[in-house]
């Protein structure tokens, strides 16, 4: 675990653009009933957010860590929007009108501004262009550079 340098949505695998083909996990034994309850709660939340059949990579941008922002940037964010020392990327995107935006067959969900969906035969170029458009809008309004959670291949 320590050798992989895991941190929020990051690791050596991601930094070095490694692709994992196989993994083995050693887990500690826990309270079975408590773990089942936690799994069910998590699945309920995920199924509300990511309906079965949606063609999407999950949340496109990482949430922004408060520790990485200046006082000037933080002044633009309502305190109630800071959750666990992070600012949800979905909040920032919603504030710049991302919900429901489209480019070709790529659409940002009307119910979640950080959920980019392929509605048919969307292209990687449309996906990239739409993400960059709203990354720029967030930067202009909040002075915050959103970081992609999705790994982009062939784009910079």
Regions of interest found by a model, annotated:
Residues 1-126, 141, 145-156:
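Phosphate/pyrophosphate- and phosphate-bearing ligand-binding catalytic cores of soluble enzymes
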Residues 134:
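Phosphate/pyrophosphate-binding loops and the adjoining catalytic core of nucleotide-dependent enzymes
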């Amino acid at each position: 675990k320590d050798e992989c340098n895991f941190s929020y949505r990051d690791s050596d695998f991601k930094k070095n653009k490694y692709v994992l083909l196989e993994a083995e996990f050693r887990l500690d034994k826990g309270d079975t009933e408590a773990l089942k309850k936690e799994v069910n709660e998590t699945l309920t939340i995920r199924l509300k957010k990511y309906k079965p059949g949606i063609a999407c990579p999950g949340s496109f941008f990482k949430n922004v860590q408060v520790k990485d922002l200046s006082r000037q940037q933080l002044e633009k964010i309502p305190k109630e929007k800071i959750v666990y020392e992070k600012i949800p990327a979905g909040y920032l995107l919603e504030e710049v009108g991302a919900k429901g935006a489209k480019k070709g067959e790529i659409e940002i969900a009307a119910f979640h501004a950080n959920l980019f969906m392929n509605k048919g035969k969307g292209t990687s170029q449309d996906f990239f262009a739409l993400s960059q458009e709203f990354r720029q809008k967030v930067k202009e309004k909040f002075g915050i550079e959103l970081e992609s959670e999705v790994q982009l291949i062939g784009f910079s």
